[in-house]
UniProtKB/Swiss-Prot annotation:
<feature type="binding site">
    <location>
        <begin position="185"/>
        <end position="186"/>
    </location>
    <ligand>
        <name>ATP</name>
    </ligand>
</feature>
<feature type="binding site">
    <location>
        <position position="267"/>
    </location>
    <ligand>
        <name>ATP</name>
    </ligand>
</feature>
<dbReference type="Pfam" id="PF02568">
    <property type="entry name" value="ThiI"/>
</dbReference>
<dbReference type="GO" id="GO:0005524">
    <property type="term" value="F:ATP binding"/>
</dbReference>
<dbReference type="GO" id="GO:0004810">
    <property type="term" value="F:CCA tRNA nucleotidyltransferase activity"/>
</dbReference>
<dbReference type="InterPro" id="IPR050102">
    <property type="entry name" value="tRNA_sulfurtransferase_ThiI"/>
</dbReference>
<dbReference type="GO" id="GO:0002937">
    <property type="term" value="P:tRNA 4-thiouridine biosynthesis"/>
</dbReference>
<dbReference type="InterPro" id="IPR049962">
    <property type="entry name" value="THUMP_ThiI"/>
</dbReference>
<dbReference type="GO" id="GO:0009229">
    <property type="term" value="P:thiamine diphosphate biosynthetic process"/>
</dbReference>
<dbReference type="InterPro" id="IPR014729">
    <property type="entry name" value="Rossmann-like_a/b/a_fold"/>
</dbReference>
<dbReference type="InterPro" id="IPR054173">
    <property type="entry name" value="ThiI_fer"/>
</dbReference>
<keyword id="KW-0963">Cytoplasm</keyword>
<keyword id="KW-0808">Transferase</keyword>
<comment type="pathway">
    <text>Cofactor biosynthesis; thiamine diphosphate biosynthesis.</text>
</comment>
<dbReference type="GO" id="GO:0000049">
    <property type="term" value="F:tRNA binding"/>
</dbReference>
<dbReference type="Pfam" id="PF02926">
    <property type="entry name" value="THUMP"/>
</dbReference>
<feature type="domain" description="THUMP">
    <location>
        <begin position="62"/>
        <end position="167"/>
    </location>
</feature>
Amino acid sequence: MTVLYDEIMVRYGELSTKGKNRGYFINRLAKNIREVLADMPELKITAVRDRAHIELNGADYAEVSNRLTKVFGIQNFSPSIKVEKSMPIIKEEVVALFKEIYSEGQTFKIATRRADHNFELDSTELNIALGDVVFDNFSYAKVQMKKPDITLRAEIRQDAAYLSFEDIKGAGGMPVGTAGRGHLMLSGGIDSPVAGYLALKRGVEIEAVHFASPPYTSPGALKKAKDLAAKLTVFGGSITFIEVPFTEIQEEIKAKAPQAYLMTITRRFMMRVVDRVREERGGKVIINGESLGQVASQTLGSMSAINEVTNTPVIRPVVTMDKNEIIEIAEKIDTFNLSILPFEDCCTVFAPPSPKTNPKLENCIQYEKRMDVEGMVDRAVKGIMLTTIIGENWDQTEEEEFADFL
């Protein structure tokens, strides 16, 4: 089947519930669509109250369609053919289209929408006229109003008529950025990229914070984390990757805290650092990939002891999921194979053999009195490095910037 499309008609998801803020949500979705299609300048993108229109102007429809399926805030979209707004020509194009898409025995229905109320026929008359032309040319065709094999949509707008027959499911959710900014604690594992994806789906613009402890962690581990962030850019546009120097803190913890408390105190320092970064960069929440009971630092007791260092809301999108459920999403978003590459992150290289599953807060506070907590956090935050990740080929196009640009 060869159909040359002129436009893609995009229908919004939950935006219909947003009342007075609807315009803001639509504008943000349009911005996100433009960002994921930025390397295709021939496209013309227009967003109006109830849908967006993407004029292809010769662009590769398959590539545009593939990218749109990953943009949050889209309920579905339909590739369309633009035809002159005259009944003889519309009928002619309907017949030509049916010759391409219709097979004997299939059922169909016509669904029309008349945005131009000066057009010669109203919606009901259009339905009848286009149904008749199908029957005249395909005598074996059968109408079925509920769940037909083919729904031919005709939309009469001011500039032209548009015909479509496919509804392609979108990613749903909310446009990225409409819920504000959050800071994702991105390790090299399976869970945190999934948490980032789920936060993006609910409209959170994420910046990825990764803790690096060279020489204990390798350049390969750092690149792996950046590659994971790059995988998420297909859902939310560019992502700022924030590398935190964590070696000094981890060495100090290892030297001055009991082995059973190494993980808890490490996570408390991480939470302090990411909270400071969040504050300086205008974030509203911290996001992590903790899943309840999966490891020692993810029991309710551990989470409570770790959370004590911040009043900032911490979102844990995968907290109630089984590992298999998390893996299923990781495979869907193409992060799983990256996540299982054998590079150790800073949580694994210093992991004690028997960490506390129910650490006492008073013990954590007592052990941290042996350390220069504020000084080390300050130095870590001052030493961060930023990388703007744009697409999966980020390492070929982007240069790192120092944190002076905060």
